[in-house]
């Protein structure tokens, strides 16, 4: 702070201060009128049209010119392509693509039904490339198909493929009334008694085996349902035939598929 005060005191006593300020303004005015090129020449700085790093790139390009000339015949430069300074286009690949046989290996196998002393087994191989969510959806679909066998015979169903998936249908078969042999009832009250199929709950029905080594299957509604209420709760009704009620009970007890394979239902 003392030095600044001394400078101020000195400038007050400097008799040629106004003259010095005028000379400085005159010099600055002259420099403003000159071009940048003239200023560079005054300061002794040589002005280059291109920076020094471009000059170094030109020197390296000059050394590799013979090699570039040797490769000029391998490609034709695109005249419309934008030229980038310092970039040298190399030769294009001129070899032809060869046909290569590509073989995709897969471990997927078609469903196989296996038989042994313990029974039969159907193996379904999981499709490859499924995500965790897709795998879960696939397993739920298979499970739904298996559970649907409780309510119908899959062998009697039709299989239709659609754009959204698969449609499985079973056509409702109505009995031919002209082929039904009427049963003559001598007493009207007997007809009323058998109008509800549950009245035959203690009556057994026999199914013949498909192989001579097996015994006939004899079963009644009492063995399949604990009560008429249970029979009604799973879809039964009094107007069913005795055989229809028995088959419903086999499906309810999850015995239908086994019985269908071994016996003539």
Curated annotation (Swiss-Prot):
MF annotations from Gene Ontology: RNA-directed RNA polymerase activity
Annotated positions of the Phosphothreonine modification: 62
Top-level taxonomic group: Viruses
GO cellular component: host cell cytoplasm; virion component
UniProt-annotated stretches for the region Interaction with the Nucleoprotein-RNA and template-binding: 245-265
Region of interest: Disordered: 42-74
Description of post-translational modifications: Phosphorylated in the N-terminus by host CK2. Phosphorylation of the phosphoprotein is required for the transcriptional function of the P-L complex.
Stored InterPro entries: P-protein-C_vesiculovirus, Phosphoprotein_C_viral, Phosphoprotein_central
UniProt xrefs under Pfam families: Phosphoprotein
Described purpose of this protein according to its UniProt entry: Nonenzymatic cofactor regulating the function and conformation of the RNA polymerase and part of the transcription and replication complex. Binds the viral ribonucleocapsid and positions the L polymerase on the template. Acts as a chaperone for newly synthesized free N protein, so-called N(0). Plays a role in virion assembly.
Family statement drawn from the similarity comment of this UniProt entry: Belongs to the vesiculovirus protein P family.
Protein name: Phosphoprotein
The encoding gene: P
């Amino acid at each position: 702070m003392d030095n600044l005060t001394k400078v101020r005191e000195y400038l007050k006593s400097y008799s040629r201060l106004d003259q010095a300020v005028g000379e400085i303004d005159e010099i600055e005015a002259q420099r403003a009128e000159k071009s940048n090129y003239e200023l560079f020449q005054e300061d002794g700085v040589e002005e280059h049209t291109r920076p020094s790093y471009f000059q170094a790139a030109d020197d390296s390009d000059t050394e590799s010119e013979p090699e570039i000339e040797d490769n000029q015949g391998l490609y034709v430069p695109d005249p419309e392509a934008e030229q980038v300074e310092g970039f040298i286009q190399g030769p294009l690949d001129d070899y032809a693509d060869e046909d290569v046989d590509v073989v995709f290996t897969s471990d997927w196998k078609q469903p196989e039904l296996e038989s042994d002393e313990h029974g039969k087994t159907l193996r379904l191989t999981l499709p490859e490339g499924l995500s965790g969510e897709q795998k879960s959806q696939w397993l739920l679909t298979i499970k739904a198909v298996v559970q649907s066998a409780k309510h119908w015979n899959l062998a009697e169903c039709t299989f239709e493929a659609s754009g959204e998936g698969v449609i499985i249908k079973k056509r409702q078969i109505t009995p031919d009334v002209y082929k039904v042999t009427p049963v003559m009832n001598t007493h009207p009250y007997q007809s009323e008694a058998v109008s509800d199929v549950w009245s035959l709950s203690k009556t057994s029905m026999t199914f013949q085996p498909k192989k001579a080594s097996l015994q006939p299957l004899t079963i009644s509604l009492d063995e399949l349902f604990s009560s008429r209420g249970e029979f009604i709760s799973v879809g039964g009704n009094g107007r069913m035939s005795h055989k229809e009620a028995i088959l419903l009970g086999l499906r309810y007890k999850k015995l239908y598929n086994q019985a269908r394979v071994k016996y003539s239902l």
